């Protein structure tokens, strides 16, 4: 989302497509940390994977969305950091909730749909594919598929859930403006109020493009809050992703993020200012999956920074959920045929947590 909020990218030969797992919190979270103990050191590095690099292709950076509640003039001294209890390894396979807990989430969603579950099936960890040093032994459930007559409900081991509408039609056209998209989301919020269960919705939409210029629009909503920190958490961890049908007045599927329910709060960590983070970025102190050959030979300069925001990395491949300043940097032209006017932006991260709490600062090559 995020809301690009949270993201993995395909190889450059395919379209640069930001993947967001979205939704709402369905079960309680947080056990308070021991305030008498010192905050443990954190590892700010993260796995890039083998799926290319994080980036966007846009005609204008404004198309990336503006619903992030963080602003540069926001005064934040600390932000919470969480241990991801569903983490297994760099593959991101989520294993934490019991089979009964997975079923409980599915039953709750079915009740909001006024539907009865008629079949269930659990996907389990294959012992032959376990990575070294994993905490798993094999056979653990990492996903539940629950079917009703009209819906298929998928619940992952970290609480994330997807509802697929078995009667879905053709997906809604991606070629919509931001205002058209917001109107569509408003219609869906009214029609599916019981399922979506959002009291104070913040509507969020953004798009990116394929190399040929085909627009790919995303539709999201999250719960507003008067507390700025809680609103930041809602934006990063509690998005609801909507896929409209062709008419725009019905849903093809909806996704709910719930991973914050499978965490332990480590503590509230002091964070650096955005100005300090930007200085680190310009000094080359950043984390990125962008290959160096795509960056201009002069490195990152002020005029290359197209967008700045504060986010949490929330994918299940992360052992720790911690905040980062994220920067979108305009990359140099690549040797790939692209639609006229289309620009490539690479994503660069600077940890928001103060350096004295990072074990790997400042070496992140």
Question: What spans do the regions from the language model cover?
Answer:
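Single-pass transmembrane signal-anchor helices and their membrane-water interface zones
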Residues: 1, 8-33
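Segments that shape or occlude catalytic/ligand-binding pockets
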Residues: 182-336, 342
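C-terminal soluble interaction/assembly domains
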Residues: 319-323, 333-365
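Short hydrophobic short-linear motifs embedded
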Residues: 2-6, 56-59
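Preferential activation on post-signal-peptide N-terminal prodomains/segments
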Residues: 27-233, 260-262
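Short linear interaction motif-like sites in intrinsically disordered regions of transcription factors
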Residues: 7-10, 71, 207, 365
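Short, solvent-exposed coil/turn segments at beta-strand boundaries
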Residues: 147-150, 155-162, 215, 242-251, ...
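Alpha-helical interaction segments
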Residues: 11, 60, 316-317
